[in-house]
């Protein structure tokens, strides 16, 4: 549940401590389930 590389902590997203930057918003990343999915599966995890 710690931030890794360019991905925020999933805990911070769930608890509302993470807020999307202007670049995140422009890319369609906002707080919620979709961001959590990208944190878990969005890198080279698989």
From Swiss-Prot:
GO biological process per UniProt: cell wall macromolecule catabolic process; chitin catabolic process; defense response; polysaccharide catabolic process
Stimuli inducing this protein: By yeast extract and dilution. Slight induction by glucan elicitor.
InterPro entries: Glyco_hydro_19_cat, Lysozyme-like_dom_sf
EC number per UniProt: 3.2.1.14
Record-level Gene Ontology MF annotations: chitin binding; endochitinase activity
Keywords: Carbohydrate metabolism, Chitin degradation, Chitin-binding, Glycosidase, Hydrolase, Plant defense, Polysaccharide degradation
Coiled-coil positions: none
Root EC class: hydrolase
The reaction(s) this protein catalyses: Random endo-hydrolysis of N-acetyl-beta-D-glucosaminide (1->4)-beta-linkages in chitin and chitodextrins
SUPFAM superfamilies, alphabetized: Lysozyme-like
Domain of life: Eukaryota
Similarity comment text for this entry: Belongs to the glycosyl hydrolase 19 family. Chitinase class I subfamily.
Function field: Defense against chitin-containing fungal and bacterial pathogens.
Name of the protein in question: Endochitinase 1B
Species of the source: Arachis hypogaea (Peanut)
């Amino acid at each position: 549940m710690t931030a890794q590389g360019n991905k925020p902590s999933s805990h911070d997203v769930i608890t509302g401590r993470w807020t999307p930057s202007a670049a995140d918003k422009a890319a369609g990343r906002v707080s919620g389930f979709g961001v959590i999915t990208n944190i878990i599966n969005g890198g080279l995890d698989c």
